[in-house]
């Protein structure tokens, strides 16, 4: 089973919207998929940060286990529109949160 990372078309006529999905290469373009990892809206301006939204950690996982990216997904990666670096989430500990509240009270 060859697995591909590709675009699946959704949206209305002349108003396309794409989902970035991981699917079996034999499945239809808009058919069954394994996992939805992002979306692409070509109707938004190119500098809009929501034009392409991808779960970077899942994309990296699927590429590491051997999934092949389609030409358009590879183009997004090469242009830097999709970054494979996972964004670090800010996690505040309970102690840091309590300390911050105490500082604001004083």
Curated annotation (Swiss-Prot):
It comes from the Bacteria. InterPro entries: Ribosomal_bS16, Ribosomal_bS16_CS, Ribosomal_bS16_dom_sf. GO terms for cellular component: cytoplasm; small ribosomal subunit. Signal peptide: none annotated. Gene3D superfamilies: 3.30.1320.10. Keywords: Ribonucleoprotein, Ribosomal protein. PROSITE patterns: RIBOSOMAL_S16 (PS00732). Disulfide bonds: none annotated. One of its GO terms (biological process) is translation. GO terms for molecular function: structural constituent of ribosome. SUPFAM superfamilies: Ribosomal protein S16. Belongs to the bacterial ribosomal protein bS16 family. This is Small ribosomal subunit protein bS16. It comes from Wolbachia sp. subsp. Brugia malayi (strain TRS). The lineage of its organism: Bacteria, Pseudomonadati, Pseudomonadota, Alphaproteobacteria, Rickettsiales. The gene is rpsP.
């Amino acid at each position: 089973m060859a697995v591909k990372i590709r675009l699946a078309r959704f949206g209305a006529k002349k108003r396309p919207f794409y989902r970035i999905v991981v699917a079996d290469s034999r499945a239809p373009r808009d058919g069954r998929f394994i996992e939805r990892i992002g979306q692409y809206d070509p109707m938004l301006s190119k500098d809009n940060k929501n034009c392409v939204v991808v779960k970077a950690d899942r994309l990296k996982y699927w590429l590491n286990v051997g999934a092949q990216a389609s030409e358009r997904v590879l183009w997004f990666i090469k242009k830097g529109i999709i970054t494979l670096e996972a964004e670090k989430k800010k996690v505040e500990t309970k102690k840091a949160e309590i300390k911050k509240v105490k500082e604001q009270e004083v």
